[in-house]
């Protein structure tokens, strides 16, 4: 069933469209998108258990997708199963945060870390050319990229830019600590799929030492 669509006007970047007239939408636990209406399925054919799992007693269909409403516009963030749950019980949408931060000209790749952790952190692959330009502008001397990325001025630059971009997120969703990587994520090390999507378990394994260091007191 069609839940939302784009009209000839009122288009919002990032939205999946305006809610259709005959469809009810609400946001449930874990920011799950719930649907109800004449065009929404009443159940799965000859699959009573699947129907009971998907449709609650009030008739709301549980999509398994996380998102939010802004006026009459619907925004989809990601699948519920892809959400991270911090050790404090808060749910974090890694893709939403990564997408937002990746618009920065200094950030090439980013991996959000939060699952079963006390707070959100990030592994960041900078756009090395822009960082070199910044170093030249600020008169920063360095022997190699690893040394440059540990310079206080460079770290301060990324801290300020990240904080500006993540203002729209709740405090518990925001990146508290980050590490700048001297090499990009790669398919050769199994960190990316052939469509360049992150393989999170592989990234977590390959960078375990760096990740653990960000959570040291």
Locate the predicted segments by residue:
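Adenylate-forming
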Residues: 40, 73-102, 131-151, 171-175, ...
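Acidic-histidine catalytic/liganding microenvironments
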Residues: 58, 104, 169
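Conserved ATP-binding/catalytic segment of the ANL
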Residues: 19-86, 114
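Active-site loops of AMP-binding adenylate-forming
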Residues: 1-13, 47-50, 128
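Conserved C-terminal "lid"/linker of ANL adenylate-forming enzymes
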Residues: 109-112, 118, 159-217
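Conserved A3 ("GATE") glycine/threonine-rich loop of ANL adenylate-forming enzymes
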Residues: 1-8, 20-22, 92, 117-119
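C-terminal boundary motif of the adenylate-forming
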Residues: 66, 71, 104-130
């Amino acid at each position: 069933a069609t839940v939302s669509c784009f009209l000839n006007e009122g288009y919002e970047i990032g939205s999946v469209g305006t809610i259709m007239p005959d469809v009810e939408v609400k946001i449930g636990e874990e920011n799950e998108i719930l649907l109800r209406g004449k065009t929404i399925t009443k159940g799965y054919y000859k699959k009573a258990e699947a129907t009971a799992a998907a449709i609650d007693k009030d008739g709301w269909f549980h999509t398994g997708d996380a998102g939010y409403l802004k006026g009459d516009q619907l925004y989809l963030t990601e699948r519920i199963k892809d959400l991270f749950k911090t050790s404090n019980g808060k749910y974090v949408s890694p893709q939403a945060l990564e997408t937002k931060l990746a618009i920065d000209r200094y950030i090439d790749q980013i991996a959000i870390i939060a699952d079963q952790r006390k707070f959100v952190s990030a592994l960041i692959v900078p756009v090395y050319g822009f960082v070199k330009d910044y170093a030249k502008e600020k008169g920063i001397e360095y022997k190699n990229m690893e040394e440059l990325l540990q310079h206080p001025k460079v770290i301060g630059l990324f801290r300020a830019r990240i904080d500006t971009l993540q203002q729209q997120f709740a405090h518990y969703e925001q990146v508290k600590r980050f590490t700048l990587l001297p090499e990009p994520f790669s398919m050769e090390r199994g960190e990316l799929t052939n469509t360049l999507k992150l393989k999170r378990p592989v990234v977590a394994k390959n960078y375990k030492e760096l990740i653990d260091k960000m959570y040291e007191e």
